């Protein structure tokens, strides 16, 4: 099976996508006027087992579009399945079949409702033919095509004589996706999760490179990456525009999809914590387990990737002050606390200054998760905690996402998550989150092998936790005003000197 360059989407198809894209949950730009500009398109072959007769086979096309607007220049992936508009009628009971067209992707679940119909789709599809347009991330024909063209860590084996390692039976697109689209494929390679990336980063995606490096280390706390799809282009395809000058060695490749093992019986960490909070059940033991796993993750990352120099304390505090000042000017609630916030940074600077004269007293910069919270971990009775989604902030360049950072920033992300779980789960009192935080931090510190002393680690965690809480106050005030009290309570607690 091959992946090949093909024609860009037609103007008729782009008109359809212009209306459809902004309504998607994963669409990365909200409330900002942007243009959708076709950039690159790739055609995929559909395996014979995933289609009907060859004349009726669907077309699978991956379109990369640039989103251009005031201060916006992003790339999104739009995988599409194009089916002939006069396909055979669906069998009784087929759900969401477009205009009487039966799903053409074999044993997988029927695709969702189509985007619409076009006479000219571009992307190598025959002009003048009526095409029914589907979101490829929700269509089995696209799943089959992605699996067939992906690079596999090892060739998938069938489960037995006559079985298909690419069995799409029971496959379903998940409805909870946020920045990407996820598909559960229980019949593929023993059970897998296919992630179709939406906001595309130029360069190696850390959600591929980091889990692969961890798996090579033998670290079992991450779902094993099994396959991935990467595309490339040459210099003539580089996006043109202001600020787009590229160094000769700049990457001209991007990952479009990732297949990882499915953690059977696992539960989302945030949902689990909310359930415990709602029942008034202590989360301390699970929080302590998570602290140990996170310390082990950071140690594995230090083994797998280069470790930098110790953080410059003066630079760090100056950067945190800068971010803090931006938050204070953006929030009236924080503005009323400006004096206390400034005093907090003064105290932090003084604490860290006292240790800068001691060699290696401050933690070294290293590869980290970068966007860690309880929603990025899974828990299963058989496996314990698994860490997911090393992609980082999808809208930031890969070079920024993979820049060495403080491991304690990941710690601060989990610490902040406990407050949200307590609030969303309606914990009976503040003690629930206090106990969870204390158990998590104590277990992390005991298991951590970075060699940072308690006082320094505590000061850094407090500083990084306040930094995150300040960001959350601004975010909630703009997007979910009813939630603003959650991070604001943490700000007050930290300013008062409490953990």
Predicted features by range, described:
Residues 1-46:
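Short Lys/Arg-enriched alpha/beta "domain-start" segment
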Residues 34-79:
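Exposed beta-strand-loop-beta-strand "reactive/processing" segments of non-cytosolic proteins
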Residues 68-325, 383, 393-424:
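Conserved ATP-binding subdomain of kinase catalytic cores across diverse folds
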Residues 159-170, 327-367:
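An alpha-helical support segment within catalytic cores of ATP-dependent transferases
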Residues 285, 311, 451-464:
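All-alpha amphipathic helical-bundle segments outside canonical DNA-binding/catalytic cores
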Residues 371:
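Conserved catalytic-loop position in the HRD/HxD motif
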Residues 376-387:
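Conserved protein kinase catalytic/activation segment
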Residues 392-448, 466-483:
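Active-site activation/catalytic loop segments of kinase-like enzymes and analogous catalytic loops
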């Amino acid at each position: 099976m091959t992946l090949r360059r093909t024609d860009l989407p037609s103007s008729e198809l782009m008109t359809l996508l212009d209306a459809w894209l902004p309504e998607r949950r994963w669409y990365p730009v909200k409330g900002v006027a942007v243009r959708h500009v076709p950039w690159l398109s790739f055609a995929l072959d559909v395996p014979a087992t995933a289609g009907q007769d060859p004349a009726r086979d669907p077309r699978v096309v991956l379109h990369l579009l640039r989103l251009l607007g005031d201060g916006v220049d992003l790339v999104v992936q739009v995988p599409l399945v194009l089916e002939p508009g006069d396909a055979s009628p669906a069998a009784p009971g087929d759900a969401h079949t477009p205009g009487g067209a039966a799903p053409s992707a074999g044993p997988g679940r029927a695709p969702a409702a189509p985007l619409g119909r076009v006479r000219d789709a571009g992307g190598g599809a025959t002009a003048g033919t009526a095409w029914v347009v589907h979101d490829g991330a929700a269509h089995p024909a696209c799943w089959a095509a992605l699996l067939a063209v992906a690079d596999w860590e090892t060739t998938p084996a069938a489960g037995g004589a006559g079985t298909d390692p690419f069995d799409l039976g029971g496959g379903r697109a998940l409805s909870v996706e946020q920045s990407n689209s996820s598909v559960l494929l229980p019949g593929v390679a023993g059970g897998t999760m296919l992630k179709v990336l939406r906001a595309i980063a130029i360069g190696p995606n850390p959600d591929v490179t980091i889990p692969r490096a961890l798996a090579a280390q033998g670290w079992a706390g991450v779902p094993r990456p099994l396959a991935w799809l990467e595309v490339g282009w040459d210099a003539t395809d580089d996006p043109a525009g202001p600020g787009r000058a590229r160094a000769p060695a700049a990457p001209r490749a991007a990952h479009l999809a990732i297949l990882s093992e499915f953690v059977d019986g696992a539960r989302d960490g945030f949902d689990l914590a909310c359930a415990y909070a709602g029942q008034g059940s202590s989360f301390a033991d699970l929080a302590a387990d998570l602290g140990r796993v996170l310390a082990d993750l950071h140690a594995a990352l230090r083994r797998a990737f280069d470790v930098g120099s110790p953080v410059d304390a003066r630079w760090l505090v100056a950067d945190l002050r800068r971010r803090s000042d931006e938050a204070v000017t953006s929030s009236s609630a924080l503005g009323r606390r400006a004096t206390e916030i400034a005093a907090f940074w003064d105290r932090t600077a003084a604490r860290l200054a006292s240790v800068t004269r001691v060699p290696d007293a401050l933690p070294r910069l290293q590869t980290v998760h970068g966007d860690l919270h309880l929603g990025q971990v899974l828990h299963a009775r058989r496996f314990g905690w698994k860490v997911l989604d090393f992609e980082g902030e999808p809208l930031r360049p890969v070079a920024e996402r993979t820049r060495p950072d403080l491991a304690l920033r990941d710690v601060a992300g989990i610490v902040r998550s406990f407050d949200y779980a307590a609030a969303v789960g309606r914990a009976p009192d503040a003690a629930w989150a206090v106990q969870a935080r204390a158990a998590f931090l104590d277990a992390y510190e005991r298991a951590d092998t970075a060699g940072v002393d308690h006082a320094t680690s505590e000061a850094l965690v407090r500083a990084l936790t306040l930094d995150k809480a300040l960001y959350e106050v601004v975010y909630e005030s703009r997007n979910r005003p009813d939630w603003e009290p959650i991070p604001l309570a943490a700000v007050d607690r930290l300013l008062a000197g409490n953990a």
